[in-house]
Amino acid sequence: MSEAPRFFVGPEDTEINPGNYRHFFHHADEDDEEEDDSPPERQIVVGICSMAKKSKSKPMKEILERVSLFKYITVVVFEEEVILNEPVENWPLCDCLISFHSKGFPLDKAVAYAKLRNPFVINDLNMQYLIQDRREVYSILQAEGILLPRYAILNRDPNNPKECNLIEGEDHVEVNGEVFQKPFVEKPVSAEDHNVYIYYPTSAGGGSQRLFRKIGSRSSVYSPESNVRKTGSYIYEEFMPTDGTDVKVYTVGPDYAHAEARKSPALDGKVERDSEGKEVRYPVILNAREKLIAWKVCLAFKQTVCGFDLLRANGQSYVCDVNGFSFVKNSMKYYDDCAKILGNIVMRELAPQFHIPWSIPLEAEDIPIVPTTSGTMMELRCVIAVIRHGDRTPKQKMKMEVRHQKFFDLFEKCDGYKSGKLKLKKPKQLQEVLDIARQLLMELGQNNDSEIEENKPKLEQLKTVLEMYGHFFSGINRKVQLTYLPHGCPKTSSEEEDSRREEPSLLLVLKWGGELTPAGRVQAEELGRAFRCMYPGGQGDYAGFPGCGLLRLHSTYRHDLKIYASDEGRVQMTAAAFAKGLLALEGELTPILVQMVKSANMNGLLDSDSDSLSSCQQRVKARLHEILQKDRDFTAEDYEELTPSGSVSLIKSMHLIKNPVKTCDKVYSLIQSLTSQIRHRMEDPKSSDIQLYHSETLELMLRRWSKLEKDFKAKNGRYDISKIPDIYDCIKYDVQHNGSLKLENTMELYRLSKALADIVIPQEYGITKAEKLEIAKGYCTPLVRKIRSDLQRTQDDGTVNKLHPVYSRGVLSPERHVRTRLYFTSESHVHSLLSILRYGALCNESKDEQWKRAMDYLNVVNELNYMTQIVIMLYEDPNKDLSSEERFHVELHFSPGAKGCEEDKNLPSGYGYRPASRENEGRRPSKIDNDDEPHTSKRDEVDRAVILFKPMVSEPIHIHRKSPLPRSRKMATNDEESPLSVSSPEGTGTWLHYTSGVGTGRRRRRSGEQITSSPVSPKSLAFTSSIFGSWQQVVSENANYLRTPRTLVEQKQNPTVGSHCAGLFSTSVLGGSSSAPNLQDYARTHRKKLTSSGCIDDATRGSAVKRFSISFARHPTNGFELYSMVPSICPLETLHNALSLKQVDEFLASIASPSSDVPRKTAEISSTALHSSPIMRKKVSLNTYTPAKILPTPPATLKSTKASSKPATSGPSSAVVPNTSSRKKNITSKTETHEHKKNTGKKK
């Protein structure tokens, strides 16, 4: 055939039902049967030439069945045997050829066939050679002006691999002069080689993630190997931070592109599969820029059907891979569209006389969304949480003056003289310090140089600390600071005059400890898992566990999630562990940290420079120390001076202490007793080499306490009050984690040091309200500005990443967008933010009963422990007028974090999670106002009664820790005793009550000592009602099975209200977090040990069981550690649930404003990115259009509106009925960095 045929068909225009056509797969056998039924015109033959695995795949069959419904098209599939073994002359004839390369396909023969027969070719064959080489692909993309990650190509000669332009550093590589800092990506140049490696920086834990073609349920694996490959040619490229999701785009011609989101294989390597075992993917809408990219890719590579990978990062879209011919799997709509477009392309090319129009399927935007329900609905739009890091090892510090030339050489080598200061964190740098310490100690052994001799104990400690954890340095654990002192250390009066002290020296400060413990990881991961349940669920089964609503939102790009952390290792690891729980990830924290956690230290958002502490804070510390140095009982003046805010917890601590100096004497003698006990243990050969929690030895524990003993009391007998937080830190750690040592009087030391710390720690952030506010602003102003911008919608609708509603049948709310901003930080920021909320005049206590109750609760809270959370949630009521102040609604929640080691009765309890709002309180409904909502009104009335007649106590509900065991191993059977059912001898409470299985959707009950599991319908959990309503239901059902008399009596009598405040964050961290198969046996064997550690004497054993979970955390180097208690986390308490956005915005503006003038009106209050939530007020509204600007209503109108309208914020919600409104909303997600600059840079 010299040229492509053109078919001219006669005027016959008979209507033929395409459904009557048989599907053409093996046409040769059917020719005779079909002859009479076929139209008289010659058919256009479309030939499919590919390997059998591809041509017989489900997507190909689905599409070919549809293509063969075209009246004039016949499909012929070339058999694999013919393709491989027959010469091209014997291949079937066709008019149009669809042929593509895959493993084992003879592309040369296909090219020869096309040359011989000259058919119309759908996917250009010569370009398929280029697609197999990533270098060529990148070159074409670059020529087309398509954005690519920054990259460099390393070509190696296979015969001489060592000769290449590659210089490898500890945390970077240099390729042809181009430097790539870790994390970076290493891709083989052959596109057929899927072994792509991502290398992580040592600061995040080092190692690499190795990606490969899916094998079962894995697509990548983490490796500790940090060095790049030494053979083969590679492309090195910058790693793009995509928040853990990739987009795969499939074109059919230049004008059609279908896009799907899936979890990035680099995140944890676990392939998410649905109930049919297929990888979970979600269709997303491409923005205009991405559609242009698809158009360019399709035309540049001359591939009509073409797949490529997009990375959405930094507000841009980058192409990182072009795969050539590929179809979408499992989308009927795509199959219809693809067949229609391919058929039209063929007809237009080979039968132009039909004038086939360009028929592109309707865009998503053109499809109307039909509303399904009506009524009052509150829709969660935004969740902002500020969270303290998890349980950590005690922070330790050692200072020494060094004068040896080797230290000066190191200081000079690292450019220390530029600023006079140097911070060494990298393994290579720490190794150099260790080498110097070893060398000096060796010299000391050989001769007595008096200058070095002076520092011998400190040099030994320096060496010991740097040698901890074996040879591998993790930059997260330790750091050395060197400061240049031109005249040596300042002299103290007791020092002899010494001319040498005038010479320059270096102050070496070694900091170590303060790492997140395995218990801290468990806490963070569990809290993340519990946070999931704040988001309403979609229909269908995502992965068979609760909180799937959030996971669906996230993987479909409808969850605009950003996680920020300060630059401390423990904070970053807490954020990564939280993300792991929140997004149901598996594996190591390093890949999660690198991809999901943004460091916020660039703009001072979450970090603070201790050198720049305000003079106010210095004054406060001095006054505090002065008061606590007086050797007398506290007087009325002391109470007045120390507790002007009237804090109940402070007054309680002062009552306990009475005389601060006498209490310090007791603490000092208890520390002396402790150090002597540890020395005694070290002398005992049985326990000399005992391993304590987290690899600590008795020797290190002794050094820790000896240093405190030495530093706490000066030679003149005065106490250093600044050491009290450190003493409390250490004893709390040992009580929780080293209880097995059974050291005497630890609980007494804990009690006294806690009482002192409860005064010192909060009061260091200001004694009077004015001081607290001033110090808080110093720490928190950038964060307050950022929170304010998070609550406003400042992005442009055009850049939105949206789910494609047409393709997403199983998704309830295709246009729902939700914004979550999580800020992980240290104690200082949490104290400061809480001070701002308490003392910054957000509400008036005298006029607002709910706020007064919240302040009373906060006055009782004595410690903001690990995992403290401050949560702000923004709702929208789409039924309210756009200009109404009631359209946007803000709620404020708080949890003081992990419980301490004291009895439960000492724990403060607030009024619960989401108690009835203030407006609802004074109003008893005489009749049901709305026939549609009888249950809601009833429930509101119950809430009102509870608030008026009974204080609400939030009882913890444990979220079951998801064990990595296979499903069959996870369930405790009747004959297998679960470690969770350990009951206290006194019968004062059992673990069982606290692990009522709500989080796993299973009900647990007690029968003797056994646990049986019975499923709770998912409907009662997260799918048709808000998670909280359903938790009430499950808890009340559970009430019949729980045999814990004391707890039940103390709980509210009314089962309906049973746990309406327990909610999400009544999630004490669940124990039994082991991944070891023999846990049950271990718990049975060690039952006695588990319930009576050294820190819990017999009298408090029962309550201890409730306060803690047992964590059998596996340590990377030491196998199983000694068992350790993981403290439960206090439930979230509602501080206020009836704030308007206008009120909150003006408050935040006044705090963030540098001047004292507070603008009375904000120029615009925009709605925020939607967030799915734990509790929807009444019914959840979806798909509302949110205007870019909402002008504040004039005050007069507001009053009347408020008076006339029913508040939508009372009590727990009734069942949530998803709704689809006809109005659309377009919520956007521009880059967060831009968002921050934009909002901090301008004042509203």
From Swiss-Prot:
Superkingdom is: Eukaryota
Provide the residue span(s) of the region labelled Disordered.
Answer: 899-942, 961-1017, 1187-1244
Does the keyword Ribosomal protein feature in the UniProt annotation? no
Catalyses which reaction?
1D-myo-inositol hexakisphosphate + ATP = 1-diphospho-1D-myo-inositol 2,3,4,5,6-pentakisphosphate + ADP; 5-diphospho-1D-myo-inositol 1,2,3,4,6-pentakisphosphate + ATP + H(+) = 1,5-bis(diphospho)-1D-myo-inositol 2,3,4,6-tetrakisphosphate + ADP
Task: Please tell me one Gene Ontology term that the record gives under cellular component.
Answer: cytosol
- State where composition is biased (Polar residues): 1211-1221
Q: Where in the cell is it found?
A: Cytoplasm, Cytosol
Q: Where is the composition biased (Low complexity)?
A: 1196-1210
The cross-references to InterPro entries, in alphabetical order and at most eight, read: Acid_Pase_AS, His_Pase_clade-2, His_Pase_VIP1, His_PPase_superfam, VIP1_N
In short, the EC number is 2.7.4.24
**Main localization of the protein?**
cytoplasm
Which key words are in the record? ATP-binding, Cytoplasm, Kinase, Nucleotide-binding, Phosphoprotein, Transferase
Which Gene3D superfamilies does the entry link to?
A: 3.40.50.11950, ATP-grasp fold, B domain (3.30.470.20), Phosphoglycerate mutase-like (3.40.50.1240)
The annotated regions of Basic residues compositional bias extend over 961-970
What Pfam families does its record include? His_Phos_2 (PF00328), PPIP5K2_N (PF18086)
Checking PANTHER family in the record gives: DIPHOSPHOINOSITOL PENTAKISPHOSPHATE KINASE, INOSITOL HEXAKISPHOSPHATE AND DIPHOSPHOINOSITOL-PENTAKISPHOSPHATE KINASE 2
Domain-level remarks: The C-terminal acid phosphatase-like domain binds PtdIns(3,4,5)P3 and InsP6. Despite its similarity with the phosphatase domain of histidine acid phosphatases, it has no phosphatase activity.
Concerning its family, UniProt says: Belongs to the histidine acid phosphatase family. VIP1 subfamily.
Which protein are we looking at?
Answer: Inositol hexakisphosphate and diphosphoinositol-pentakisphosphate kinase 2
Q: Which organism is it from?
A: Pongo abelii (Sumatran orangutan)
Top-down, what is the taxonomic lineage of the species of origin?
A: Eukaryota, Metazoa, Chordata, Craniata, Vertebrata
